[in-house]
């Protein structure tokens, strides 16, 4: 009797739980079948784990983002994602122009190939819009598949669904948000054209944006350019400049048992790199790199180093690659400071050391070569005059300096969902809430640009 009663009680309890779950089921429109569930409205409703895919599929923004992320588009291999985006924009009645972008091989030779291209889209025949939204469609390696997850609970807020995968943040979140923001704008203001520019190769030198900038498509008729990068939803008032260089030291090989018969390139490069590493901490008056109140100090990163062939051979060559994030000053002045610092250390350790500038492709003319990268620019100041945003500065580089601006009255904004802190990592991800807030941010920036179109 007692067992029968307990069994009946258990069945009744399970039925109640199932009924409650049914009452709080999220429909495809993002709202509840029952009013018992509320906790902040349709943007913040509670859902079940099995409904995450439905949330994505029911949203034009989120489903476009998923399609973009699911397509592998590591730099120099953006063809597939570009073709998808062209088809998508064409289906939304945009006029789409495809611009092929050459690439340089390891020797510096320019290779023409159809495997990557920029995309420039605009409504109808309005090929010279006053407002342009732009982001990049390439990603860093390796490819990480698209996935959805959630906090460790049986249910969660819709906004908290975590979207993971390579490019979810950098930069396909901005691409998706910009497309939907442009469509929303054209629905409200069909008489004010808006352009979409999606470029390749941002992660490897900016060849895509440079190609656009030097082409007929860069008509100079725009008054507002909105660049997309992960800024955590803040407007960026500027970012640091950039100088990069390769340091190559040539030694003389010998048997390690008789090191005095050779000259170790590794032994010579170590003290040089130690000095280079501290240039951002040394005052300019003492030979260091400049700092500023807005951007802080200049930082250097020795990101790559190799040398020698075996432990029992005196190293004949050593190589290091360094990235410099400039907080102030002219990049050419920074190059001079770096050159002098390297020469001073090299000649202090060995009187007959010869330090030379090189393009990296010719026969070396000195013991120590400094090969500065082609990309070099000073700090980039940007506009941040739109109310309702936090304002910040960032340390990373963008395509902004690669776009040649015509005229003095062009507003340049940098904005996007997600954080740069996960952008190139294994944990690259952002939430549904961040994506949808990003879309609203772009809409706000476009609305401000419309005011400039219609004073």
UniProtKB/Swiss-Prot annotation:
Keyword Metal-binding: yes
Main location: secreted
Gene Ontology biological process terms in this record: proteolysis
A GO term, aspect molecular function: metal ion binding
Keywords assigned by UniProt, alphabetized: Glycoprotein, Hydrolase, Metal-binding, Protease, Secreted, Signal, Zinc
Entry EC number(s): 3.4.17.-
EC category name: hydrolase
UniProt-listed SUPFAM superfamilies: Bacterial exopeptidase dimerisation domain (SSF55031), Zn-dependent exopeptidases (SSF53187)
GO cellular component: extracellular region
Note on cofactor: Binds 2 Zn(2+) ions per subunit.
Glycosylation sites: 93, 390
InterPro entries: Bact_exopeptidase_dim_dom, Peptidase_M20, Peptidase_M20_dimer, Peptidase_M20A
Annotated Zn(2+) 2 binding sites: 170
Binding residues for Zn(2+) 1: 170, 203
Segment forming the signal sequence: 1-21
Pfam families noted in UniProt: M20_dimer, Peptidase_M20
Catalytic residues, chain numbering: 202
Cofactors named for this entry: Zn(2+)
Localization in the cell: Secreted
Similarity field: Belongs to the peptidase M20A family.
The name this protein goes by in its record: Probable carboxypeptidase MCYG_07204
Native species: Arthroderma otae (strain ATCC MYA-4605 / CBS 113480)
Lineage start: Eukaryota, Fungi, Dikarya, Ascomycota, Pezizomycotina
């Amino acid at each position: 009797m007692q067992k029968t009663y307990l069994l009946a009680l258990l069945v009744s309890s399970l039925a109640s739980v199932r009924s409650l779950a049914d009452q709080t089921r999220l429909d495809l429109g993002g709202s509840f079948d029952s009013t018992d569930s509320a906790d902040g409205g349709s943007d913040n409703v509670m859902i079940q784990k099995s409904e995450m895919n439905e949330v994505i599929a029911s949203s034009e923004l989120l489903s476009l983002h998923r399609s973009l992320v699911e397509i592998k588009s590591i730099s120099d291999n953006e063809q597939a994602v570009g073709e998808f985006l062209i088809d998508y924009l064409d289906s939304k009645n945009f006029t789409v122009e495809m611009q092929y972008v050459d690439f340089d091989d390891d020797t510096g030779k320019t290779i023409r190939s159809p495997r990557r291209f920029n995309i420039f889209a605009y409504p109808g025949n309005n090929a010279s819009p006053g407002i342009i939204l732009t982001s990049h469609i390439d990603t860093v390696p390796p490819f990480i598949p698209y996935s959805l997850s959630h906090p460790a609970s049986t249910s969660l807020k819709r906004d908290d669904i975590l979207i993971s995968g390579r490019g979810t943040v950098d930069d396909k979140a901005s691409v998706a948000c910009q497309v939907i923001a442009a469509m929303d704008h054209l629905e409200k203001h069909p008489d004010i054209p808006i352009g979409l520019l999606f470029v390749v190769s941002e992660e490897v030198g900016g060849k895509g944006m440079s190609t656009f900038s030097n082409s007929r498509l860069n008509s100079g008729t725009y008054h507002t350019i909105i660049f997309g990068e992960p800024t955590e939803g803040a407007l960026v008032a500027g970012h640091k400049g950039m100088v990069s260089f390769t340091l190559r030291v040539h030694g003389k090989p010998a048997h390690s048992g008789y090191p005095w018969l050779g000259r170790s390139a590794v032994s010579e490069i170590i003290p040089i790199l130690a000095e280079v590493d501290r240039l951002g901490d040394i005052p300019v008056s003492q030979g260091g790199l400049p700092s500023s109140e807005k951007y802080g100090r200049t930082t250097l990163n020795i990101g790559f180093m190799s040398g020698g062939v075996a432990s029992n051979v005196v190293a004949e060559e050593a190589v290091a690659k360094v990235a410099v994030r400039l907080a102030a000053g002219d990049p050419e002045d920074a190059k001079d400071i770096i050159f002098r610092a390297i020469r001073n250390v090299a000649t202090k350790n060995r009187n007959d050391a010869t330090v030379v500038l090189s393009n990296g492709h010719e026969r070396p003319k000195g013991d120590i070569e400094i090969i500065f990268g082609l990309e070099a620019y000073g700090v980039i100041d940007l506009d941040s005059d739109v109310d309702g945003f936090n304002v910040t500065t960032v340390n990373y580089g963008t395509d902004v300096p690669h776009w040649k601006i015509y005229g003095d009255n062009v507003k340049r904004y940098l904005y996007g969902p997600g954080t740069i802190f996960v952008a190139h990592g294994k944990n690259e991800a952002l939430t549904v809430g961040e994506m949808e807030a990003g879309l609203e941010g772009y809409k706000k920036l476009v609305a401000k640009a419309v005011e400039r179109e219609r004073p």
